[in-house]
C-alpha cells in the first residue's frame, strides 16, 4: 500500500525550490494561525480571518505548485501528497463548519478537535511527499531538510501541552509528587520525540550544519507560536 502511494523523484532543482517556497508560505500561515489561537482569540469569532487567509492561500499555492510539477513530469499517479491535500481540504471545510457552529477553539482544544486532527494528518502527508520525492534517496536535499524540520515543528506544536520547555514555571512550580512526576516524564517524552527525528536524519549522513538547520527551522516555526521559552 505504501509503495503505491510513494511519489516519483523530483530531480529538477527549480521544482524543489518551488516546493520550498510553497511549503514556507503554508506553514508560516499555520504558525500565524496558531499564534492567533493563543493570543488574540477573544477578539474574533470568525473563520474568515487574515491568518486563515495566509494558511489556506498557502495551501492553494502548495496544491497548484504540486499539480504544475506533476503535469510537467507527466506524473498522473495518486500519491501521498494528493492524499494529504485531500485530507487537508476536507479538514479545512470541516474546520469552517466547526467555527461557524461552535466558535473558535481555546486552550488545548485546537490540538484535539477532529477538524484540526485532519489538518495535522494532511499536513504530515504533504510534508512526506516533499521528503519522499527527493532526487537521491541516500541524502537529504534542501527541500527534504525543510520538510523534516517542518514535521518536527508540527510535532512539537501538537505536543505542547506535555512540553515543559515552553512553560517551565507552570510545570515545576507545584511541589506535589504527581506534578513533579508528570513534569519529569514530559522531559523524557520530548527527548524521545526529538531523538526519533534526529536519529532518523543521521542515517542519511547529514552534515552537522544541516542538523543545526533542521533544529533552527523547527525552533523558528514554534517560536512564532510559543515564544514563552524566551521570556521565562
Can you describe what each PLM-predicted range is?
Residues 2-59:
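N-terminal signal-anchor module of multipass membrane proteins
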Residues 10, 71-78, 134-141, 201-210:
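Membrane-interface helix-boundary motifs at transmembrane edges
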Residues 19-29, 81-95, 119-128, 141-164, ...:
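Alpha-helical transmembrane segments of multi-pass integral membrane proteins
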Residues 32-53, 97-114, 161-181, 231:
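Membrane-interface interhelical loops and short amphipathic "cap" helices
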Residues 53-69, 117-132, 185-200:
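Hydrophobic cores of alpha-helical transmembrane segments in multi-pass inner/ER membrane proteins
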Residues 63-66, 70-103:
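Long, hydrophobic/aromatic-enriched structural stretches that serve as scaffold segments
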Residues 76-80, 97-147, 167:
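Membrane-interface helix-loop-helix junctions at boundaries between adjacent transmembrane segments
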Residues 223, 228-232:
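Single conserved hydrophobic/aromatic residue that forms the stacking wall/gate
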Amino acid at each position: 500500500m505504501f509503495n503505491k502511494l510513494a511519489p516519483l523523484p523530483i530531480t529538477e532543482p527549480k521544482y524543489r525550490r518551488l516546493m520550498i517556497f510553497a511549503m514556507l508560505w503554508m506553514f508560516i500561515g499555520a504558525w500565524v494561525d496558531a499564534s492567533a489561537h493563543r493570543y488574540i482569540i477573544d477578539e474574533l469569532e470568525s473563520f474568515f480571518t487574515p491568518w486563515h487567509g495566509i494558511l489556506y492561500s498557502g495551501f492553494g499555492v502548495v496544491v497548484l505548485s504540486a499539480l504544475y510539477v506533476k503535469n510537467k513530469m507527466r506524473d498522473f499517479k495518486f500519491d501521498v501528497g494528493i492524499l494529504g491535500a485531500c485530507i487537508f481540504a476536507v479538514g479545512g471545510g470541516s474546520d469552517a463548519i466547526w467555527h461557524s457552529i461552535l466558535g473558535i477553539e481555546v486552550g488545548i482544544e485546537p490540538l484535539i478537535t477532529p477538524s484540526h486532527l485532519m489538518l495535522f494528518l494532511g499536513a504530515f502527508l504533504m510534508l512526506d511527499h516533499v521528503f519522499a520525492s527527493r532526487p537521491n534517496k541516500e541524502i537529504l536535499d534542501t527541500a527534504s531538510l525543510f520538510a523534516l524540520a517542518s514535521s518536527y515543528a508540527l510535532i512539537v506544536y501538537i505536543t505542547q501541552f506535555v512540553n515543559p520547555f515552553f512553560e517551565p514555571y507552570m510545570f515545576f512550580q507545584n511541589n506535589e509528587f504527581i506534578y513533579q512526576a508528570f513534569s519529569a516524564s514530559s522531559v523524557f517524552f520530548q527527548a524521545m520525540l526529538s531523538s526519533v527525528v534526529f536519529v532518523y536524519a543521521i542515517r542519511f549522513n547529514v552534515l552537522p550544519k544541516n542538523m543545526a538547520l533542521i533544529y533552527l527551522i523547527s525552533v523558528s516555526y514554534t517560536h512564532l507560536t510559543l515564544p514563552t521559552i524566551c521570556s521565562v
